[in-house]
Swiss-Prot record:
Catalyzed chemical reaction(s): UDP-N-acetyl-alpha-D-muramate + NADP(+) = UDP-N-acetyl-3-O-(1-carboxyvinyl)-alpha-D-glucosamine + NADPH + H(+)
Localization terms from the record: Cytoplasm
Gene designation per UniProt: murB
Domain FAD-binding PCMH-type: 31-203
Active site: 179, 232 (proton donor), 302
Enzyme Commission numbers on file: 1.3.1.98
Name of the featured protein: UDP-N-acetylenolpyruvoylglucosamine reductase
Primary site of residence: cytoplasm
One GO BP annotation of this record: cell wall organization
Alphabetical keyword list: Cell cycle, Cell division, Cell shape, Cell wall biogenesis/degradation, Cytoplasm, FAD, Flavoprotein, NADP, Oxidoreductase, Peptidoglycan synthesis
Annotated signal sequence range: none
Similarity comment text for this entry: Belongs to the MurB family.
Length: 306
């Protein structure tokens, strides 16, 4: 990026822009080369101005949360990475209506902080997300879920920054499937989720805490949490478990370079230290090929490659 464009971009935000920032520092896999720039925006005005500038200058860009579902290329990202901070991490609770409460939550909030805030307020509905790394915006796009629950179960709608400005859409207008908002990229190309609205139930702190503790206990028992990973690597096929299929093919512990199919959970790929994006791709292809040959089922990645 030319110096005059760097200066122009820097003037749009309060937080200093980080140039040639390693994305290994911003992804849960701890893998990936540098982005040309990493920009933090703290409100809708900053975001709108940054996006408008990047579009006008034809500079590639994308918003990420905590990089928990991303595999970044070893050569990095030739563009600008945007992080949602400040106002994007707020929670607004409406007065109760009968047995339910509506909450508006910024897209940049971490799922852990959101769940803890709900616990403090005694609001139930999002406990299944407790312990899922990442931020809310990405969770909505992925229709994140676990232990029988998913975002779409309790979502009322979202606010988006689209090419035409801010748009509010209801969950009834959103086509969700397992781990995906299916028509997001088709209907809203390059749109950014600003916030999401949920319908929750006030049940008391102790009830919510009990649910969260139960979910976390299951995670600690079944999932690797000590090594860098991106959570579930493959989508579960209809009526099947990706982890069970991989395990049945004897692939736990399979290693390429410095990445490995976790011995603890077959649908987790872990970075054992110094892994690369190429290692992950090679491991993925081997797992997909073996599972298809032995079961006839084609596994699709849940993670995104950039």
């Amino acid at each position: 990026m030319k110096e005059e464009k760097k200066r122009a971009l820097s003037r749009l935000v309060l937080t200093p822009v980080q140039w040639e920032r390693s994305l290994a520092l911003h992804t849960s896999f701890a893998i990936g080369g540098p982005a040309r720039a990493l920009v933090q925006v703290v409100n809708e005005e900053e975001l709108a101005e940054v996006v408008q500038f990047l579009r006008a200058e034809d500079i590639a860009w994308r918003v990420i949360g905590r990089g928990t579902n991303l595999v970044v290329a070893d050569e990095g990202y030739i563009g600008v990475i945007i992080l949602l901070k400040g106002d994007f991490a707020t929670i607004s609770i409406c007065p109760p209506t009968g047995k339910t409460v509506a909450a508006t939550v910024g897209a940049g909030i971490s799922l852990s902080r959101l769940c803890k805030s709900c616990q403090e307020r005694g609001l139930s509905g999002l406990e299944f997300m407790y312990g899922i790394p990442g931020t809310l915006g990405g969770a909505v796009i992925m229709n994140a879920g676990a232990w029988g629950g998913e975002i779409s179960d309790v979502l009322l709608g979202v606010s988006l920054l689209s090419a035409d400005g801010i748009v509010d859409i209801s969950s009834a207008e959103m086509n969700f499937s397992h781990r995906a908002w299916q028509d997001y990229e088709e209907r809203w190309p390059n749109a950014v989720i600003l916030s999401a609205r949920f319908l929750l139930r006030p049940v008391g702190q102790e009830v919510v805490k009990s649910h969260c503790d139960s979910v976390m206990a299951k995670r600690r028992l079944a999932q690797p949490i000590k090594q860098p990973n991106a959570g579930s690597f493959f989508k579960n096929p209809v009526g099947e478990s990706a982890g069970r299929l991989i395990d049945s093919c004897g692939l736990k512990g399979l290693t390429f370079g410095k990445v490995m199919v976790s011995p603890e959970h077959a649908n987790f790929v872990v970075n054992t230290g110094g892994g690369t994006s190429a290692d992950i791709r090679n491991l993925m292809k081997e797992v997909q090929g073996t599972v298809f040959r032995e079961t006839g089922i084609s596994l699709q990645p849940e993670v995104h490659f950039i």
